[in-house]
């Protein structure tokens, strides 16, 4: 069997549809999806097998990254650091741009990325044929920069094979790097954490999801049931009250939604215990961020 394997950094502005694309390619719910921008905070490896036209069985290891953005808050700097690290580690990049975005995000990407890349135009199902053609023409001025320009829709599964074919074409022959049926090397407790965070985005509005995070305090993995004890961390007592809700209605909704998604992903029953705490300025303190698994790589002179 002829095989290929390689790491591919998936880069884009917030809300470009990176996580939706990966979940569609995997046919599974692993990456956090939200209608709110900038929901993804950590790098995640997603492993997609693909047989290309040349007969190669390719193992494409996508590095799902936080959206490219610049803010002074330390948490946001940690997120940008992860995206930059992914670009450095990958042998190929895919820049995902919404058909509704201007070209500034891609121009910023070009200033940061030194690796060969494919430009993918997402959400074409939400635009007219004329709008898609116009946007493709706008990007053509950079045709010497990218390997290929692929319009696609993750929601409608349009042109996804074309993207995978293009990626596989530019990977080198190699033995597979992971087991055949593995979709991610993420630990289940980390996947469960992201599912709880996704439920926060689903049920809470305004700034609260962005000023909150989740700490898994205890995780017990048994044959028939997983037991998860977690804390939702917010910055203000007023936010804590909103997360809990009157008579606990909000925290019950968040917990029920998260538990059902966990059971679907883990394919077993899940017991979920959620607590809510207020911790002032957690997103600005390096020690707090390290406990939550965030790291910041500072630039060296």
Swiss-Prot record:
Residue ranges of domain KH type-2 in the record: 204-280
A Pfam family it matches: KH_2
Family matches, as PROSITE patterns: G_ERA, KH_TYPE_2
Keyword terms: Cell inner membrane, Cell membrane, Cytoplasm, GTP-binding, Membrane, Nucleotide-binding, Ribosome biogenesis, RNA-binding, rRNA-binding
Region feature (G3): 64-67
G1: annotated segments: 12-19
Domain of life: Bacteria
Chain residue ranges for the region called G4: 122-125
Membrane topology: Peripheral membrane protein
Binding site for GTP: 12-19, 64-68, 122-125
GO biological processes: ribosomal small subunit assembly
Any single Gene Ontology cellular-component annotation: cytosol
Subcellular location: Cytoplasm; Cell inner membrane
Region (G5): 152-154
Function, in words: An essential GTPase that binds both GDP and GTP, with rapid nucleotide exchange. Plays a role in 16S rRNA processing and 30S ribosomal subunit biogenesis and possibly also in cell cycle regulation and energy metabolism.
The name this protein goes by in its record: GTPase Era
UniProt source species: Helicobacter pylori (strain P12)
């Amino acid at each position: 069997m002829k095989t290929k394997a390689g790491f591919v950094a998936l880069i884009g502005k917030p809300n470009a549809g990176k996580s939706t694309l990966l979940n569609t390619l995997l046919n599974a719910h692993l990456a956090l999806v939200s209608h709110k921008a900038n929901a993804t905070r950590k790098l995640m490896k997603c492993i997609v097998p693909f047989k290309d036209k040349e007969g190669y069985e390719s193992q494409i290891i996508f590095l799902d990254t936080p959206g490219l953005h610049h803010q002074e808050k330390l948490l946001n700097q940690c997120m940008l650091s992860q995206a930059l690290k992914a670009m450095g580690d990958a042998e190929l990049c895919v820049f995902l741009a919404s058909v509704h975005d201007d070209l500034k995000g891609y121009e910023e990407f070009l200033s940061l990325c030194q690796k060969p890349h494919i430009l993918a135009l997402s959400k074409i199902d939400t635009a007219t044929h004329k709008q898609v053609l116009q946007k493709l023409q706008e990007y053509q001025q950079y045709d010497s920069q990218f390997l290929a320009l692929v319009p696609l829709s993750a929601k409608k599964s349009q042109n996804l094979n074309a993207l995978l074919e293009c990626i596989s074409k530019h990977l080198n022959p190699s033995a597979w790097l992971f087991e055949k049926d593995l979709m991610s090397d993420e630990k289940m407790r980390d996947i469960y954490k992201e599912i709880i965070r996704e439920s926060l985005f689903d049920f809470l509005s305004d700034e609260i999801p962005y000023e909150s995070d989740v700490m898994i305090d205890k995780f017990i993995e048994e044959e028939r049931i997983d037991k998860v004890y977690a804390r939702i961390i917010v910055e203000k007592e007023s936010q804590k009250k909103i997360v809990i809700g009157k008579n606990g209605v909000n925290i019950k909704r968040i917990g029920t939604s998260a538990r059902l998604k966990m059971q679907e992903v883990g394919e077993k029953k899940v017991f979920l215990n959620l607590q809510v705490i207020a911790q002032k300025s957690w997103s600005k303190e390096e020690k707090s961020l390290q406990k939550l698994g965030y790291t910041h790589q500072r630039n060296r002179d």
